[in-house]
Amino acid sequence: MKKVWLNRYPADVPAEINPDRYQSLVELFEHAATRYADQPAFVNMGEVMTFRKLEERSRAFAAYLQQGLGLKKGDRVALMMPNLLQYPVALFGILRAGMIVVNVNPLYTPRELEHQLNDSGAAAIIIVSNFAHTLEKVVEKTSVQHVILTRMGDQLSTAKGTVVNFVVKYIKRLVPKYHLPDAISFRSALQHGYRMQYVKPEVVAEDLAFLQYTGGTTGVAKGAMLTHRNMLANLEQVKATYGPLLHPGKELVVTALPLYHIFALTMNCLLFIELGGQNLLITNPRDIPGLVKELAKYPFTAMTGVNTLFNALLNNKEFQQLDFSSLHLSAGGGMPVQNVVAERWVKLTGQYLLEGYGLTECAPLVSVNPHDIDYHSGSIGLPVPSTEAKLVDDDDNEVAPGEAGELCVKGPQVMLGYWQRPDATDEIIKDGWLHTGDIAVMDEDGFLRIVDRKKDMILVSGFNVYPNEIEDVVMQHSGVQEVAAVGVPSGSSGEAVKLFVVKKDPALTDDALITFCRRHLTGYKVPKQVEFREELPKSNVGKILRRELRDEARGKVDNKA
């Protein structure tokens, strides 16, 4: 496919990027830490951590992983925490030790956590105490040999940290009881690390940096193997696209999305580290009043988010009173940005929401709207520099201009493959082209618009939910004979999970089934609706026709609207 989108690039955006400007994320980090040493890198709960402090602490943590725990280059280390100052310290410590970061959603259930730890072969995990009870239930059944435990306030000043830890544990009661007698505290790890010798390993571009877990095209969570070069390439692509709006050493980005999510990891953490910017870490973005109070304290210049976050902020009266004069980049991703939200955003802030598209397997950015656009296109924008894109039919032939086809992409940001799953890798990457599973159309200027999903994935507040996983859990309930999970529109989260169930036990209720799901699934995966049926539609070979149920369910929602 001819790169027609290049003609629509702003004049200051290049067609190609250099993914080899740095040899590794370690080199990028150390360069930024030297250049911006005394500038703030992260702020959380009012506590500022400069680049110098981050460099010192991450070096100590790397030394502890090497000398204290005896871990080697290439070992996998899991990170399970929300946005806290501990996160970047641990993240860059792991990378500087030549090890591989395995990001874990802290809201995972024991079943989900056990799978990810074992699949990745994680040798160690850094976890915040609020979720230690989850780890306790499965740690003996996993590959984990070392547990490093931290509390919410452990990277704050002594007085503030003591207060935060007391309130979190005893007032808000957010730390369920747990028993991990062999765990070492994060503070102790750093104290030991400061006295140990950090040995800088040779880290090259093709070394793995992250195992970033995703469902891919099936419900089994798989680790996308992202190399240092993959991440560096995507950083260069983001910087080339948004760079004209950004000023090195002068940015403050609002990081309300969790850093364990690939979007915030690349767009917020890594990009603004390279730019010498400051990340305002929001630990609990669901507390909208608390988030707005934080925003009122800082002249934020950039903000990333998903539609649900932007919508919630717009509906907060205090947010409407904030000063947006410093804001010059608003980027939306993870899920479609609704027109009404985009229109309200530009009316309030004076800034257009630049919507983009990506997937974990691409580190994640594939396309974005150009920075000079002065309207909400409703599209996912143009392919980023050094990226090829094509639309194909079911036989892998390119479709005619203007026709819908599966979006396939090729570029330096595309993952190596899925960790220890060559068959799954071969299904999604063919001749170097990554098949996204999303059906798109491209207009004459190269703007892409997603019109459907080839795969049955459900997108809840920017998180992928896979029907296979939901159905596997529901089928464990003794009262269920058959089940199909589909996505239906939701005003609050973009989509929500709906179940169609054939009962085995006539007494089964929707409340009982949802309660059962809550015990086995992370919150965003829990079904919001249950519809009981005498039978489910099937193909001539007995396969449940999810698409038919999904179209029917969406039709009911549309009719109600």
From Swiss-Prot:
Its top-level enzyme class, in one word, is: ligase
Q: Which domain of life is it from?
A: Bacteria
User: So what family is this one in?
Assistant: Belongs to the ATP-dependent AMP-binding enzyme family.
Enzyme Commission number(s) from the entry: 6.2.1.3
| Chain residues that bind ATP | 213-224
> What function is annotated for this protein?
Catalyzes the esterification, concomitant with transport, of exogenous long-chain fatty acids into metabolically active CoA thioesters for subsequent degradation or incorporation into phospholipids.
Q: Which organism is it from?
A: Salmonella typhimurium (strain LT2 / SGSC1412 / ATCC 700720)
Its name, as the record gives it, is Long-chain-fatty-acid--CoA ligase
